[in-house]
A protein has these predicted regions:
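Boundary at the C-terminal end of the N-terminal hydrophobic targeting segment
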Residues: 23-31
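Surface cap/lid and interfacial helix-loop subdomains adjacent to catalytic sites
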Residues: 150-170, 190-356, 368, 382, ...
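Bacterial N-terminal signal peptides
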Residues: 12-23
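Active-site catalytic motif of lipid deacylating hydrolases and related acyltransferases
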Residues: 41-49, 75-79, 85-172, 335-397
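Bacterial N-terminal signal peptides that target proteins for export
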Residues: 2-14
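Gly/Ala-rich beta-loop-alpha elbow adjacent to hydrolase catalytic centers
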Residues: 177, 181, 185
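N-terminal module-boundary/linker segments of secreted carbohydrate-active enzymes
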Residues: 30-68
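Active-site-proximal beta-strand/loop segments in catalytic clefts of secreted hydrolases
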Residues: 86-89, 127-131, 178-179, 208-212, ...
């Protein structure tokens, strides 16, 4: 019998959230006990152990001429940088907040979005009582989710404070999140990091696609963050890479979930992950999960005319390009597929969320935010680490 196909580690869970938008508001459930982040068991990823971030991910290169070599992701030895990651909404647990027993969704999402960062930094990823898919459904039906949101952030804050106090050892760090994870990281920056100059100096980069970062139109800072700007040039530190993806010619509609500012005079920040500061089309370095059975505009993806890949991931350098667009309240990363006649690689990619056969226009290509530029994002962090290492090596011995 053929193996059962399944949604991707990130997109599958969020698609379930989309499907659940039509569900009734769930009955409240008693939250799980508060986690103790001094225990390693409260973390999905920690340096130096076997977990979701030490998994060697087999990936095949996919080029216009067809498949290339296969590689395995690696874990860096003694990198000069830490990465602290908060995963997106993936939990299918009952109630408004998840328990502290990570399921397949949390593990596969973390593996897909974050494991490759372990090639350039020490990985830290707390388990937290996140707002569940049921909470997304309840919110969409008009429910008040203030308490579930506060509970989730309280866990992330506790994990963060444990990390800084007992695990970070004064090292520079990069923050990584997506969707709900990006919301949590936003709050960490605004409430903790911006209020501590010494801590802010150690934050070298925040990578938080998939949730709106508001800035005054024409500015780089001043909305969501008071001091931390959007990145405006390659190699810049102490800044934020943020964007929400929309397919070319499909701009966010008024009132969109992502890519549309709901405050007068504001826009949604967009930083091109491949070339911060660029307002032109730039080719992206992507890692795609190839085993998804989710609906895709244009029909199922044929990754290559040579057939399906032998690995669960393919890497494409230039299959898609991204361009930051800001137009009044709208701010988004426009995504274009680059396929010429005779090319052997895919002629389209996915990313939209389908509900009952209809794609949600206000969510854009939310499911592809990380995958479409993961190679670029890892490189952004890696270049900062390399710069730190070279500066350390250049310092005279005392």
């Amino acid at each position: 019998m053929p193996r059962k196909r399944h949604p991707g580690p990130v997109s599958g869970a969020i698609a379930l959230a989309a499907i659940s938008l039509t569900a009734a508001t769930p009955a409240p459930a008693q939250p799980a006990a508060a986690p103790d982040y001094s225990k390693d068991s409260s973390w999905l990823c920690l340096p130096g152990r076997s977990d979701s971030c030490s998994t060697a991910l087999p990936t095949t290169a996919l080029n216009p001429t067809g498949y290339g070599s296969t590689e395995l992701s690696t874990v860096a030895k003694d990198p000069p940088l830490d990465c602290f990651y908060v995963y997106p909404t993936v939990s299918s647990d009952a109630g408004m907040n998840s328990d502290m027993s990570p399921g397949r969704e949390e593990k596969l999402t973390t593996e897909s979005q974050f494991a490759r960062f372990a090639s350039v930094c020490r990985p830290f990823a707390p388990i937290y009582r996140q707002m569940t898919l049921a909470a997304v459904a309840a919110y969409s039906a008009g429910a008040d989710i203030t308490q579930p949101a506060a509970l989730a952030y309280g866990d992330v804050l506790a994990a963060w404070r444990n990390y800084i106090a007992t695990r970070n050892e004064g090292r520079p760090f990069v923050l990584v999140g997506h969707s709900q994870g990006s919301l949590m990281v936003q709050q960490l920056i605004a409430r903790e990091i911006e209020k501590d100059p010494a801590l802010a100096a150690r934050m070298k980069l925040a990578i938080i696609p998939g949730y709106n970062v508001l800035v005054p139109q024409g500015k780089l800072v001043g909305g969501t963050f008071k001091k931390t700007p959007l990145c405006s040039r390659p190699g810049q530190t102490g800044c934020v890479i943020a964007y929400s993806s929309f397919r070319e010619k499909n701009e966010p509609p008024a009132g969109a979930m992502f890519g549309y500012a709901d405050q007068p005079g504001m826009t949604v920040g967009c930083v091109n992950p491949a070339l911060p500061g660029s307002r032109s089309w730039v080719k992206l370095d992507s890692y795609w999960f190839t085993r998804s059975s989710l609906q895709v505009p244009g029909g199922p993806i044929q990754w290559s005319t040579e057939g399906q890949p032998s690995t669960p991931y393919v890497r494409t350098e230039g299959l898609v390009s991204g361009k930051c667009v800001n137009d009044g309240p709208r701010g988004y990363l426009s995504i274009r597929t680059n396929h010429a006649p005779g090319d052997k690689w895919a002629d389209h990619v996915g990313g939209e969320i389908a509900v009952l056969g209809m794609f949600l226009p206000g969510w854009g290509m939310h499911l592809a935010d990380m995958a479409e530029a993961e190679g670029d994002l890892v490189r952004d962090a890696g270049e900062i680490g390399a710069s730190l290492r070279s500066r350390t090596a250049a310092q005279p011995a005392h």
